[in-house]
């Protein structure tokens, strides 16, 4: 957030912000922690995680300041994030915003995600950055039991700029974001 995103913690829903969509809604504590460290949420919000009427439900909801999209069925966040990127491209003459989407294995097994991704590649949405957490597991178990898709190859065929990195290495993540912002694709 602090190094790459356009985000004002005093106005977390400002129109001029970058968008972040967690298609993997169960990872919302990561977002809530960042919002807490950015002074958007309070410790009491984190302590009430997954409680009824909490500002920190078990999947993100837009009623929480700083949350850009509700999480729903697998793959929905991919379509929502791509839709945001399309809208920003169409509505802004000098589009300076980025849309970031975090997806997992289960998301990419859903046709809604792949259809939206194909459209994004076709339309060359260059201000869209998607992180794919390929850990070879989804809710039903290991992905090799039900899926043998080479997603890097598939996304390259859909005209995406694909970078495969170690997601635990901050420098690799940093360099990948910098490179993604330089590529017009």
Where are these regions (language model features)?
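N-terminal amphipathic, basic-rich helices that act as targeting or association modules
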Residues: 1-36
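Glycine-rich ThDP/TPP pyrophosphate-binding loop and its adjacent helix/strand module
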Residues: 9, 17, 60-185
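Generic detector of well-ordered alpha-helical segments enriched in charged/polar residues
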Residues: 32, 46-50, 174
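Generic surface-pattern signal
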Residues: 36, 51-54, 182
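Residues that form or immediately flank small-molecule/cofactor binding pockets and catalytic motifs
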Residues: 25, 54, 167
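Alpha-helix initiation and N-capping motif
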Residues: 28, 42-46, 125, 148
């Amino acid at each position: 957030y602090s190094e790459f995103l356009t985000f004002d913690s005093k106005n977390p829903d400002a129109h001029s912000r970058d968008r972040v969509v967690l298609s993997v809604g169960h990872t919302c504590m990561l977002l809530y922690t960042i919002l807490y460290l950015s002074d958007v949420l309070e410790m009491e919000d984190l302590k009430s995680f997954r409680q009824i009427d909490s500002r920190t439900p078990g999947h993100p909801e837009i009623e929480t300041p700083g949350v850009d999209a509700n999480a729903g069925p697998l793959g929905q966040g991919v379509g929502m994030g791509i839709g945001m990127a399309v809208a920003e491209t169409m509505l802004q003459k000098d589009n300076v915003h980025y849309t970031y989407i975090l997806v997992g294995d289960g998301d990419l097994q859903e046709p809604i995600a792949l259809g939206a991704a194909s459209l994004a590649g076709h339309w060359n949405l260059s201000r869209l950055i998607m992180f794919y957490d390929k850990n070879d597991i989804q809710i039903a178990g290991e992905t090799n039991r039900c899926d043998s898709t080479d997603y890097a190859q598939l996304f390259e065929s859909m005209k995406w700029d694909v970078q495969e990195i170690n997601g635990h290495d901050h420098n690799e993540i940093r360099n990948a974001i910098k490179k993604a912002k330089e590529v017009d694709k």
